Amino acid sequence: MAAILEARDVSHYFGGLKAVEKVTMRIEQGDIFGVIGPNGAGKTTFFNVCSGIYRPTSGEIIFRGEPITGLPPEKIARKGMARTFQNIQLFKFMTVLENVKIGFHIRTKSTMFSALFRTKQYWQDESFTQEKAIEILDNVGLLTYKDTLANNLPYGIQRKVEIARALA
């Protein structure tokens, strides 16, 4: 079976500091995979390398059979990899549904022009994102919160909203 995500001898240095040293791992479809370690062990740095925020000092990252080493985060996201961050980064004065719909921005074709003038493309994209966002909220158990402002949610639910947005 082909791996969803694979790291081969990935290292990342900050000057002389070895934050990540020769990490090799393979995640198959359906796997539940955890990365554990003490503070400062390099876990976040490793995820930053995998998602394109940092370029590895050495090694290779492969996503769905395709090398993504050194690609910028937006290109990696377009290939289907998403992530959340340690600090919650929701739009606090938008609803849960609106926060999840924002996660679809890389999949829609609407431009600022089409949104401004409410073109056919805009309405098609709006319909698609609305339907899919509601589906995701239902799948992660957040549908009852869809009209709630993110700012009014407890921390744990806010984290789930971030995960739902990453799934978009």
Indicate residue ranges for each PLM-predicted region.
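Helix-to-loop junction immediately C-terminal to a conserved catalytic motif
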Residues: S51
